[in-house]
């Protein structure tokens, strides 16, 4: 797994999405997380108990910026609070 920091996450998500991700993490909504190569698969419960599946892959650009390819089964689909919670859980 490519190492990343809170600053990296701040470059990927809006402050609101990161805040909602922190709330999900604090509430124990990250149900599973598995590192697979340079990415993760996981499951995060939504605000109302729904269960959403996430897959993501991280890499660094030539200038060192963190890049993400992600997918979530929620209606947002990517760069959502569920993906943020999964990444925050890894820090």
Model regions: which residues?
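Long, low-complexity, compositionally biased intrinsically disordered regions
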Residues: 1-91
């Amino acid at each position: 797994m490519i190492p990343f920091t809170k600053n990296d996450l701040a470059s990927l998500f809006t402050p609101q999405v990161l805040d909602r991700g922190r709330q999900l993490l604090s509430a124990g909504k990250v149900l599973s997380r598995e590192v697979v190569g340079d990415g993760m698969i996981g499951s995060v419960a939504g605000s109302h108990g729904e269960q959403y599946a996430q897959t993501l892959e991280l890499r660094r650009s030539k200038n060192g910026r963190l890049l993400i390819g992600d997918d979530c089964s929620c209606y947002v689909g990517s760069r959502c609070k569920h993906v943020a919670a999964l990444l925050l859980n890894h820090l």
